[in-house]
Amino acid sequence: MGLPWYRVHTVVLNDPGRLLSVHIMHTALVSGWAGSMALYELAVFDPSDPVLDPMWRQGMFVIPFMTRLGITNSWGGWSITGGTVTNPGIWSYEGVAGAHIVFSGLCFLAAIWHWVYWDLEIFCDERTGKPSLDLPKIFGIHLFLSGVACFGFGAFHVTGLYGPGIWVSDPYGLTGKVQPVNPSWGAEGFDPFVPGGIASHHIAAGTLGILAGLFHLSVRPPQRLYKALRMGNIETVLSSSIAAVFFAAFVVAGTMWYGSATTPIELFGPTRYQWDQGYFQQEIYRRVNAGLAENLSLSESWSKIPDKLAFYDYIGNNPAKGGLFRAGSMDNGDGIAVGWLGHPVFRDKEGHELFVRRMPTFFETFPVVLVDGDGIVRADVPFRRAESKYSVEQVGVTVEFYGGELDGVSYNDPATVKKYARRAQLGEIFELDRATLKSDGVFRSSPRGWFTFGHASFALLFFFGHIWHGARTLFRDVFAGIDPDLDAQVEFGAFQKLGDPTTRRQVV
């Protein structure tokens, strides 16, 4: 049977045994990829600096997903939080990877078995003896089982009743750890940044799924509805399944890009909106002002800012700065962060404190402009020096560092001042090692950006797939030219025009 590549799946159209087989094989491939990818990432992952070289800077993709579900230790003796462990137990990163690979192998064998033994009694309609599936009943079974899994995850795993809990952090991604979470049953449970909503929503959705599954197992669909929605056609199942998948893909693309309790910034990196809104910058200034209010010096106040918080306030960690088609981790772009140089404070010769205007997300280059506390431009790095009025040299700008490696160091050399003004456009200033990985200096996106782009793209593709297969199953009779409810016996080939007795073919 010479089928074109886009129609090869018709070989399992009326073959329930082999339809099951290919789905088991698909599960084997997915699980095998997950386990293999985890082992690859563990082979290249450097856990030595969770503050300045976290998993998301290194381009880890599956490690963050394991971590958010409660895996923190490795058989290599390290912990994701930076400590060492002596007895990580079976559910370490390697243990989860191994479990996926073993499961993949079992699915592979099961797929082969079902391909060979495809003609099972369970797939035969006892009235006709032909292969058939009771699709509404199968729908009920799957709904019930997925409801049980959903309820179990929310009620046991997330709450810590039987399981580790999930990754929970503060709003600034500084104190994250795995801990049990109590369900949030009030309005706060609908806040996407409240972890308790994860538990309560899984419990509620799981309960609904169990009840809906029992309903579909015990109540048969009305005949009109059965016919209207083509419930006897396997392509209806394909269409509605694709709808469920693309809807889920759009949802998770949103929760990943805009941020939520399910996508902690410690595991996936900050969102672009945190840079756009100056989210971390505001918190840093709040902490510095609080230190000054306690009679600490400017240097002492800035020295109390955690490197982790300062590092979030750097444009190189903005997932929208990396191009969609630039391969590699963030570390392959601007380099591996080694240390925070400190916060630069610029002043002109009149004593005004100056603030460098920060680069917006979608700019590759941006003019260096320094403004005072009232937003008045006091200095800049001019494009045309002949017409300049506010150049660093003319205004006499100096820079002094507070906190970090250069704490207390000041510069009045214009070339050095301009160098740090340019770097201050990009947020807090860090020493970056570009030699180790031969980093090219071009920003890369984080796993947050890749996940969003991938899921949004496939969701769009699957949306069209849903429309395509939905139309095919709803209008099957129109496309085939045969009315599925045609009662009269039609002998194919007897008439020149199908079903028209006046056009009977002449026997030669």
Curated annotation (Swiss-Prot):
Location in or out of the cell: Plastid, Chloroplast thylakoid membrane
Pfam families: PSII (PF00421)
Subcellular location, principal: plastid
Segments passing through the bilayer: 21-36, 101-115, 140-156, 203-218, 237-252, 457-472
Membrane topology: Multi-pass membrane protein
Superkingdom field: Eukaryota
Family matches, as SUPFAM superfamilies: Photosystem II antenna protein-like
GO biological process: photosynthetic electron transport in photosystem II
Cross-referenced InterPro entries: PS_antenna-like, PS_II_antenna-like_sf, PSII_PsbB
Matches recorded under Gene3D superfamilies: Photosystem II CP47 reaction center protein
Cellular component annotations (GO), alphabetically ordered: chloroplast thylakoid membrane; photosystem II
Keyword Ribonucleoprotein: no
Free-text comment on the cofactor: Binds multiple chlorophylls. PSII binds additional chlorophylls, carotenoids and specific lipids.
Keywords: Chlorophyll, Chloroplast, Chromophore, Membrane, Photosynthesis, Photosystem II, Plastid, Thylakoid, Transmembrane, Transmembrane helix
GO-annotated molecular function: chlorophyll binding; electron transporter, transferring electrons within the cyclic electron transport pathway of photosynthesis activity
Protein family: Belongs to the PsbB/PsbC family. PsbB subfamily.
Annotated function: One of the components of the core complex of photosystem II (PSII). It binds chlorophyll and helps catalyze the primary light-induced photochemical processes of PSII. PSII is a light-driven water:plastoquinone oxidoreductase, using light energy to abstract electrons from H(2)O, generating O(2) and a proton gradient subsequently used for ATP formation.
Subunit structure: PSII is composed of 1 copy each of membrane proteins PsbA, PsbB, PsbC, PsbD, PsbE, PsbF, PsbH, PsbI, PsbJ, PsbK, PsbL, PsbM, PsbT, PsbX, PsbY, PsbZ, Psb30/Ycf12, at least 3 peripheral proteins of the oxygen-evolving complex and a large number of cofactors. It forms dimeric complexes.
Protein name: Photosystem II CP47 reaction center protein
